[in-house]
C-alpha cells in the first residue's frame, strides 16, 4: 500500500512538472518527453482537452491552424479529430505550457495528429513550420479544404495576422 502511494505521488509530481514546464524550454527538449493522456473533449479541429493523472489541460495542436467551427470544413475537421482521439490512448508532448493549457504534439497510435491534419488538407501549417511542405502537397493534390476554390485561412476569419 505504501509503495503504491509513493508511486502515485511520484507519478503526479512528474506530470505536474511536465505540465508546468516553462515556455522557454526548447522544442527538442520538450518533444522528447511525452505523457500518457486521454481525450476529455474535442473543442475544435486544433484544440482538445486531455486528462493526465486526473488533471485536465486544454491543448492547442502544435504546428497547425484548423478552420474555425463557423467556417467551411470546421465541423468536418472537428469530427475527424474526434474520431482519431476519442477512446484512444494519447501521448502528449508539451512544447509550451501555461496554467491549465498548452501547445503540444499529440500522438495517436504513434501518429502525429498535427501531421495528419496537414497531410489530409484539414489544416494550415503555421508559417515557416516543419509541416509547411505537407500543406503544399495537400494543396497541390488537392484534398481536404483545398478542394474549395478559395479557402479562407482561420486567422483571416478571426481577423488576425498570419499564423
Outline where the language-model segments fall.
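Small beta-barrel nucleic-acid-binding modules, primarily SNase/OB-fold domains
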Residues: 2-163
Amino acid at each position: 500500500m505504501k509503495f503504491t502511494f509513493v508511486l502515485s505521488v511520484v507519478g503526479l509530481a512528474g506530470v505536474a512538472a511536465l505540465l508546468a514546464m516553462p515556455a522557454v524550454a526548447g522544442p527538442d527538449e520538450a518533444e522528447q518527453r511525452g505523457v500518457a493522456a486521454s481525450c476529455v473533449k474535442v473543442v475544435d479541429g486544433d484544440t482538445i482537452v486531455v486528462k493526465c493523472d486526473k488533471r485536465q489541460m486544454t491543448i492547442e495542436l502544435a504546428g497547425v491552424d484548423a478552420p474555425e467551427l463557423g467556417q467551411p470544413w470546421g465541423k468536418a475537421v472537428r469530427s475527424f479529430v474526434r474520431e482519431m482521439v476519442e477512446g484512444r490512448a494519447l501521448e502528449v508532448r508539451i512544447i509550451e505550457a501555461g496554467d491549465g493549457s498548452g501547445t503540444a504534439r499529440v500522438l495517436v497510435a504513434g501518429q502525429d495528429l498535427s501531421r495528419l491534419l496537414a497531410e489530409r488538407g484539414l489544416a494550415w501549417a503555421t508559417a515557416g513550420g516543419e509541416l509547411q511542405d505537407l500543406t503544399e502537397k495537400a494543396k497541390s493534390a488537392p484534398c481536404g479544404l483545398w478542394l474549395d476554390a478559395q479557402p479562407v485561412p482561420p486567422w483571416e476569419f478571426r481577423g488576425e495576422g498570419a499564423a
